[in-house]
Amino acid sequence: MERLKVELGERSYPIEIAAGLLQHAEVLTQTIKGKRVMIVTNTVVAPLYLERIVQLLSGYQVEHLILPDGEAYKTLATFERIMSALLETNHGRDTTLIALGGGVIGDVVGFAAASYQRGIPFIQVPTTLLSQVDSSVGGKTAVNHPLGKNMIGAFYQPRHVVIDTECLQTLPAREFAAGMAEVIKYGIIWDVEFFCWLEANMSRLQAQEPAALAYAIRRCCEIKADVVGQDETEHGVRALLNLGHTFGHAIEAEKGYGNWLHGEAVAAGTMLAANTALARGDVTEQQVDRIRALLLAANLPVTAPPEMDFAAFIRHMRRDKKVLEGKLRLVLPVGIGHAQVVADVSDAELLAVIESGRDE
């Protein structure tokens, strides 16, 4: 078993990674506070893993809430359902929430944990590749608003992240590919050696070879833990983790949450960011070609929706959380293995990149 730690002083917490972790009760019970537990999951994950988790927690008073599946339900209405379930059964601050599912479940349950009685403990049990390598680590919790993604939320750290890589065996191929967008992101912004490893081992990852999967997930979590330990609330280096997300969030909002998966939108956004960096001279054509080839090898889109024009992108991008003093700030690669936040990309530059990105 791999065990990492997010170093945040009194709010530090472990990340445990292994195949078959959800067969061992002590993995979960070591960080449960009190005797009451509420598991929140969705209609897809519940038939696969809910009963197993309930059995592991036989010594606790366990309740569960099963929510609809999908990004379309990452809303204040879903948040309110969790609040009501907790209130109706008189849960207190000694209750532990368990987020059993992908990124949507982790985000909305984390926000509920941050908000209920001003904060109760929660444990992340991510079941998708995207949530295992990214969203379960770092304490970003949120719901969407019709005008923008993740606009209502809080920074609130879990007590524990439990990553059972066997959960990926039940993941649909499209969801697995979407998770690879975040895996590739880490290589682009932080670790050129990891990027090269991904180029050499993508076929092993696609085949879900256990050793390759375990290494990729561990490396992503190492990078995420390092970044979050340096900058928990995204005032500095953590912003680099948003490579492709400003463009990607615009695609998700414009096309309707769930029609493009988050990872698919991030992949297309990553190519737009790479092409913006190319126009500025911060990457070479060869490096952009390598990024494109790796995304394609992971079965990810590399172009924006052809019907989505500059005006549609800008309308959503102006609401991005990284906007400061009215200036749009973009995360752009610097070669492969580094990235930067820039605030001087002109509308003319964006227009050229977006228009070419639709026709690529």
Curated annotation (Swiss-Prot):
Its main location: cytoplasm. NAD(+) binds at residues 69-74, 103-107, 127-128, 140, 149, 167-170. It comes from Aeromonas hydrophila subsp. hydrophila (strain ATCC 7966 / DSM 30187 / BCRC 13018 / CCUG 14551 / JCM 1027 / KCTC 2358 / NCIMB 9240 / NCTC 8049). It catalyses: 7-phospho-2-dehydro-3-deoxy-D-arabino-heptonate = 3-dehydroquinate + phosphate. It holds the Pfam family DHQ_synthase. Binds 1 divalent metal cation per subunit. Can use either Co(2+) or Zn(2+). InterPro entries: Dehydroquinate_synthase, DHQ_synth_AroB, DHQ_synth_fam, DHQS/DOIS_N, DHQS_C. It is an enzyme of class 4 (lyase). It is found in: Cytoplasm. GO terms for molecular function: 3-dehydroquinate synthase activity; metal ion binding; nucleotide binding. The lineage of its organism: Bacteria, Pseudomonadati, Pseudomonadota, Gammaproteobacteria, Aeromonadales. Signal peptide: none annotated. This is 3-dehydroquinate synthase. Its cofactor is Co(2+); Zn(2+); NAD(+). Catalyzes the conversion of 3-deoxy-D-arabino-heptulosonate 7-phosphate (DAHP) to dehydroquinate (DHQ).
